[in-house]
Amino acid sequence: TKVSLKQKLDIKKNEIYIFNKNLNDLIKENIILKSKKNKYFLNTNLDLYLGKFIQNPKGYGFVDELFIPPRNINTALDGDIVAVRIRQENDTIEGEIISILKRNTNTIVGTYIQKKGDKFGFVIADSERIISDIYIPNGNSLNAKSYDKVIVQIQRYAEGTKKMVGKVIEVLGFKNEIGVDYLSVINEYKINNKFSAKTKNQIEKIPDKIKDSELKNRKDLTDMCIFTIDGIDSKDLDDAISIEKITKNQYRLGVHIADVSHYVKEDSPLDKEAFNRGTSVYLIDKVIPMLPKKLSNNLCSLNPLETRLSLSVFMNINSNGTVTKYEICESYISSKSKLYYENVNKYFDNLEELKVDETIKETEMEEKIKQSLSYAKELSLILKKKRQKRGALDFQLDECKIKLNEYDKPISVEVNERGISNKIIEEFMIVTNEVVAEHFNNLKIPFVYRIHESPKEEKLSTFLNFIKNLGYEMPVNFSPKTLQSILDDIKGKPEEATVSLILLQAMQQAKYYQDELGHFGLATTYYSHFTSPIRRYPDLQIHRIIKDYLNKNLSSVKLERYKKKVVNTAVVSSKKERLAQKAEEDYERIKKCEFMEDKIGQKFTGVITSISKTNIKVLLPNTVEGIIYIKANDQEGNYKILQENCSVENPLGKRYVVGDNIEVKLKNVSVDEKIILFELV
């Protein structure tokens, strides 16, 4: 029906007119058929396909796996919902976009250009997936100057040879001004960095202190040796831990998570805003929080020596890593110290004294924390060994750490070292998420799960061919365990980072879902996100469900409501997570380019991470990646591909293989295009 079509395509009120027009046009063209009962069907006789168009920066695109050459795009933009006619010529199958059902883009962030003497201008989009520029007629520029970053509202989409026409609705500032790149990124990905008046009003009404009445029916854990371990700049402390050894072969692990749902009531202005944000966004030294700071950095944050409301999971875990008993309960805690990853790692390596809160220094509690850390290290290694045994994938990929000065310019780019304390918290959060997911899956209660489906056959085949070309044996059977054995084989070898990266690219993206379908990467049947409700909405949503279950408040009416809520939460939160990841990656790429700008002409040693007919990608030890342009296997080509995606030969007969360490010289940097260009030495 028309109603179900609108729901499926997520048609907003301001899109109804164009939706109706497009639908009527498709009916006239006999592409969509309308029945007497006002139901709509795709004309199956026309070999048509409906889907989302994904634009490649090189000009071509895809609708799902169907290739769309540049000549057949028909003015579609990245993300548009389109109707495609499938064509087959000889052995080639490709698509032609014949109609655009729903436009995905109505505003574009980019750089305004106006040539001297012209009364009009145009905007070059920041997104590499918006290939054509936007024409800005006289009077539509909002007084923007050349090289200003602007937000453009599309007034007319491209038709035939006519360009898109737009109107500047906001000038963000000159492109090199402090903070303009940040504003460009958050506007590009529609990330809201301001809270509504209704939300602010609700926050102001929340008391600054916890009342005694709020502690009723909760376990008092304030005397326990509970502490947090976080990054030195972290202010939103979601999780705290406690641990003791109850027998020679048995640990009792407590994971205590901020009770955000106590403050964020369902369907309140605060809840609606958190739902729409979906996640906190971390742009190097800037945080766009899911929740206002009064909650994220104060009332909900498990700050030391402050009474905080929490949800606790206690687990008895034996020396094999098996959870033999567990309890989920509402609680309140008082963290005894805020520890930092960097310091705890050095403490384990006997390089520094443990830095605890001054109030417990040289007390019995300090000794308890040190003993707890010793137990935590033991248990984390047990849990990791168990995960590895079942085949959980451990990608050997470095994360970067970028430091900015007061002018937002990068002063260092380096590998973010992860030590034993990082791995302790990671293992403890994983086992907690597994326990919670399995418990509520067994209860058959509506829930939000974190799922990771197995790789699609085509992408996995590409990866397996790649490792075969590198000389590794192809596995006979396919499972997480066999893939992890490949990662184990390459550990410490030059191609380690590359193989990990290509395997990661072969994986499907993890997402939120209302049914438990397992987590391929972790090789586990049950998984959820429970441990970060300050910064992730799915965690907040399942906290509500858990608390209603614990308090026996799950009426049939509420269960029905939750059934719908978890579906909506999973869809929207997955989408918001992708946008946040893209924004974080984009901002990181910009800052890496800025860091390299003043190093043109300098030489570097890096590792080859990929080879194609057009370029060789090179990764430097500090995680900066650049490309070397080449031409291979065509009439003008002076390079020869020896093995697809693996090796290439230059005109002098020198071979370059993925994983090789090579010396390169920095040739050029384009911050606007986010490209770092090397040349071979």
Predicted features, each with a name:
Residues 1-254, 261-307, 338, 352, ...:
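Charge-lined substrate channels and their catalytic hotspots, especially those that engage the 3′ end
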